[in-house]
């Protein structure tokens, strides 16, 4: 079995000044290809530390992806450290120098002398093309390992991993490419409760389960390795969906917003949104996807009671009698939002995101959500975990999306989630 490791470089990563999203993305991407990372090391911008970690980890791994330290500044030391670790000199790669000169010419810029550093590679290095940036990738064999050097810029890293790194390791180590993956998106359940339901199942050989928490969702990944396991994947996926029931809200989608976008795109149906506690989050997540203008008619943030009355037509008496966070108010918000442009659907939210503003009757985390359709209105009052303001807003948006998703599938719109409480009208 090939042993894959990752070395992340940079003082800002080591000190926690930036979150290392590159490492998370790389590990997740490798897992989707059926390849697990055995170890990840983070090291700062000190030459002696880089040399030591290259020499030490190359004794144990078969492949090491090194990320960062390929820029033109004095603290970019990956190439120099690799050369010293192998007892080599740095030499200019003429092909990459030409690439740099052409890149700056195309962008109507004069190339700084410091950028020439990016064409200096260890003598034994094999250049790895980076068509989307100025940092030259390369690979070097040291001890038992191939060290594969990539830039820290996320877009450049992702391009090189997909186009260069994965094909290289598959060919070099004759890896079986027969890997399939299904993803199930869930809300309302924690990892432990999902695992309690899934782990008693007897999985066929070659099929494994993984979990990824990205609140408000938890993603279940079902891996199948080998032809027999791949053939059984649909049956296993169906069984898991049956066991989890309403917890599963999407399949092979990263978020519920993506699921809603996919279902509404080119459907001819239209959506309007009126948001109070979610503050535009529902609308914003849909606008992230190209083509959302084909169905999204408007998104209104009606935060104050006055805006609910004047923009959406909520009856002042409703607010006086029931309050802003109530079923009657949110239903009138949804009806008003739908009526403005005669949309097919309208979502509305009103809640207490915290950390202040809660009462004994309506504590922080209390949210009213409504879905207005041409045939009527669905609504519910839910109680969400109080861990953070952002979590309350994110979960509120997710539940609103799920109500719309269920209506589009002609399923029951109001369902129970384990970790989401519900109040009566």
Curated annotation (Swiss-Prot):
SMART domains: MoCF_biosynth (SM00852). This is CinA-like protein. Belongs to the CinA family. It comes from Shewanella sp. (strain ANA-3).
